[in-house]
Amino acid sequence: MASSSKASDSSQRSKRSDQGMGKDAAAASVVPIHANLTQLIRQVQSGRLAYIKEKLEVNRKTLQRHSCSLFDVAAAAEVASRGTDGGNALSQRAAERQCGSDLANGIGERDVVSVQEENLATGTLALSSSGATAQRTIVRFVKLPLVEKIPPYTTWIFLDKNQRMADDQSVVGRRRIYYDTVGNEALICSDSDEEIPEPEEEKHFFTKGEDHLIWRATQDHGLNQEVVNVLCQFIGATPSEIEERSEVLFEKNEKHSGSSDKIESRLSLDKTMDAVLDSFDNLFCRRCLVFDCRLHGCSQNLVFPCEKQPYSFDPDENKKPCGHLCYLRFPQWREGFKEMHDDGLAGGATYTMESGTASQRVDVNVMYESEDSNRQKGNIRSMTLVGTSGSKIISSVSAEESTTTPSADISETENVSSDLPPSSLRKHKISKHGPRYREHSPGKRQKVFTSDISFEGNIMNKLSIPEIRDTRLESRESGGDKLRILDESTKKTSRKDMCGESPATTMENVGRQSNKVSSTKNFLESTLSCWSALERDLYLKGIEIFGKNSCLIARNLLSGLKTCIEVANYMYNNGAAMAKRPLLNKSISGDFAENEQDYMEQDMAARTRIYRRRGRNRKLKYTWKSAGHPTVRKRTDDGKQCYTQYSPCACQQMCGKDCPCADKGTCCEKYCGCSKSCKNKFRGCHCAKSQCRSRQCPCFAASRECDPDVCRNCWVSCGDGSLGEPLARGDGYQCGNMKLLLKQQQRILLGRSDVAGWGAFIKNPVNKNDYLGEYTGELISHKEADKRGKIYDRANSSFLFDLNDQYVLDAYRKGDKLKFANHSSNPNCYAKVMLVAGDHRVGIYAKEHIEASEELFYDYRYGPDQAPAWARRPEGSKKDEASVSHRRAHKVAR
């Protein structure tokens, strides 16, 4: 027992000693920091004193010079005033002498004039005067008509579209100033004591000396908790403020350093697409297609659709070259791309080529190789080229690749011409017993050597790369010169072969051209490696948007960076156009071909079974019941339901129970990320002509406007077709349920109302249910609307309009002329909340036929105790007694 107690005592002593040593070490580490900071403070204070003394001396000298200049100006002014006073004294004495002589002569007497008033008749007055010049004047009064004053109103800002309230415009938590209508006295009061804001904590403002102290301390000892705690003792600031200030100082010094200049001088092409689009994603609104959207705000949640645009390739015959460097100007590229995107390659293909005066036909029986050979080798088997005379034409072959050809194939095949178009450069196995082969060579069996030929060499031999090279890169210029020589030599060889050279001479040419093909391949690798990270990302984005259209990609995304032929070259050699087939050569493309393959896989996975049956798109059945939820239309009919704010969902494929749209009871819109075949997605209408303004239209029945992107027959054209947009219909028909979207409002005039204050008047006559305009304003919360409503009640005005469960429209400060339309129990207009492109908007419509210059009224739906005196119904009228009251005198759409 004694030994155990001694052991425990020794262990406790050791722990205490360790803790004491730890505290001593911490204190020892703090001591030098404290001493260094004390020395730094002394240096800062001494420097501060020297700076103050120097500043005082400079100020003293400046003040002395300024005082001397003011003294000189004052002295000059005094001398000038003395000379002026002397002249005035002489003239004053002369005037006094003249006045004395006049008094001596008796001229100083004044005439006494008396005026007498006499009322002759109503509205007239006679004035008579007595004296040396007696006169009588008759004055007639004119009564001016009474003109009422213009109704007072504050300045307002016109809005053609709703905007969200700015954060600094809120009245919640602020003391308001009210004006007493009787005594015109300003009263500062608040609705409740809870609205009085609590005093904010004062922030510490750092001086130059404190900044110098923080910078030196962090540079010498680093920024850790011990240094921050010691700095808090010398500087009256919190640790968080010191850490923030140190970061600011670090960034400020980084900008002035030389390394930051080098970083900023780098080209933006080295950045990736995500880094470049960082500010774009924060500022650009994908729903309104504008920057700095005032309606949806910045930094929105990015929602990308799961279904991407299908890859398409327009026929080259229907396209025009986009410029002098367009791939369409080179027939070899045109044929190559046409063959790349031709889906009917199961049978033979025939090409006609011209070289000098000779004309040949290429007959190919296509049969794909195995996947193993395609993965091991990215090269393409050649084809048989037969001349009109039946002679065999020999092509150039890569030496290193011809050695890998099986002997069985060599015994039965022979090399063919390299003048084939790139379109024919696929891995094909040539059948020597095809029917077309015997047709062109009757009675004579030909032997063809099968060889693997590099498709890069064929492309570069037929295309003069120096015409499209980038003059900014010297390496590419030198490579282009080499390719010009290769091109010329290849053409000479082709002519000789066509004239019928011997097989031995032809094989020598093959050996020479194999080296040229390898040099061409090296140049191609350097050309493809010149693509920066941003250019590659832009190219992939162009593939996603425009498909395999190098013209549109170069024009819209790579303008000034790459030409059309360079994009086509990269597209062909990188295997983007063949991404759907296992025939890619990844020796050059590398990971970027895999990225494009990922794009294709995502696109194929996004397509549902409904689009994959029988190899063609299946038409969806549109009915008025499939447009959305029937319950939405039922709630729309009564006019008393509260609309729900829409927010796009980011669901992939089909929406489930966790979908935010389904949870809130709204339909998925075109801005959602879900599939087009989602059961919760609103599919628009396919109404016939002039049916979109009836209850049979699912859009109109659901209080929605038709969307040209969703509805089948409701489309808009605003051009002549020069930009590829659809032409206008010949009958001039246009959907009548897109007035808010197209802003086709009537002309509204502003004038004095016969009811109260200002009023809105229609300029031209309108018919029943015609769209008049939109009620715009600020989008505020319901809490903000309650606070503002108390202020508006004091001014006996109402500009609040219930929009949905999240926002209220306030047109007091910002709005349009329809905000002046007054309330009436027997209105000629009505307000209706419509869903336009995912946003709720208030439209004003004519309830009946309205003549020109007639004032507009609509029912605010006041409660019995909320309507002002001028808006109350006359006694005995019991119409609409059951009007629904919405908060504080808010306007409500039916």
From Swiss-Prot:
Q: Give the protein's biological function.
A: Polycomb group (PcG) protein. Catalytic subunit of some PcG multiprotein complex, which methylates 'Lys-27' of histone H3, leading to transcriptional repression of the affected target genes. PcG proteins are not required to initiate repression, but to maintain it during later stages of development.
Q: Single GO cellular component annotation?
A: PcG protein complex
Record PANTHER family: HISTONE-LYSINE N-METHYLTRANSFERASE E(Z), HISTONE-LYSINE N-METHYLTRANSFERASE EZA1
Q: Which reaction does it catalyse?
A: L-lysyl(27)-[histone H3] + 3 S-adenosyl-L-methionine = N(6),N(6),N(6)-trimethyl-L-lysyl(27)-[histone H3] + 3 S-adenosyl-L-homocysteine + 3 H(+)
Source organism superkingdom = Eukaryota
Compositionally skewed regions (Basic and acidic residues) per UniProt: 872-884
The residues forming a coiled coil are none
Q: Name one Pfam family in it.
A: SET
Q: What is its main location?
A: nucleus
Q: Organism source for this protein?
A: Zea mays (Maize)
Question: What is the designated name of this protein?
Answer: Histone-lysine N-methyltransferase EZ2
Biased-composition ranges, Low complexity, are 1-11
Q: Where is the composition biased (Basic residues)?
A: 425-435, 885-894
Q: Where is the composition biased (Polar residues)?
A: 395-421, 503-513
The segments labelled Disordered in the record are: 1-25, 395-447, 491-513, 867-894
Please report the stretch or stretches of sequence annotated as the SANT domain.
527-577
GO molecular function terms here? chromatin binding; histone H3K27 methyltransferase activity; histone H3K27 trimethyltransferase activity
Which enzyme class, named as a word? transferase
Which SMART domains does the record cross-reference, listed alphabetically? CXC (SM01114), SET (SM00317)
EC numbers listed for it are 2.1.1.356
Keyword S-adenosyl-L-methionine recorded:
yes
Boundaries of every SET domain copy: 746-861
What keywords are assigned to this protein? Answer: Methyltransferase, Nucleus, Repressor, S-adenosyl-L-methionine, Transcription, Transcription regulation, Transferase
